[in-house]
Amino acid sequence: NIYHGCVHNMLHEKSEDILKALYKSASFVVQAIAFKETRNYIKHLSELRNVVTYEERTIIEIFLNLKNGGTVDFHLMSEALFAWSRKRIVKGSAL
């Protein structure tokens, strides 16, 4: 679960590699959410950014940045993922 992994990583591991893996997982969740809402599978994340919410766009953009070798801002990126995953749980979406 992304939420649990994020909390554990923020408190204990503080691993950039774990954070990157969590963002990769989150990108698949965003893709699934978009499919559920639109009934249209969007393969490319660059296209997915155009049909998702602001928070989900942020998750995709951070993941793409990390995937392309971008710098990790551990605190900021962890907080963004934590807030997004918490919100998805409250809304009732499985993570």
Residue ranges and their predicted role:
Residues 1-95:
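Conserved nucleotidyltransferase catalytic core and NTase-mimicking acidic/glycine-rich helix/loop elements
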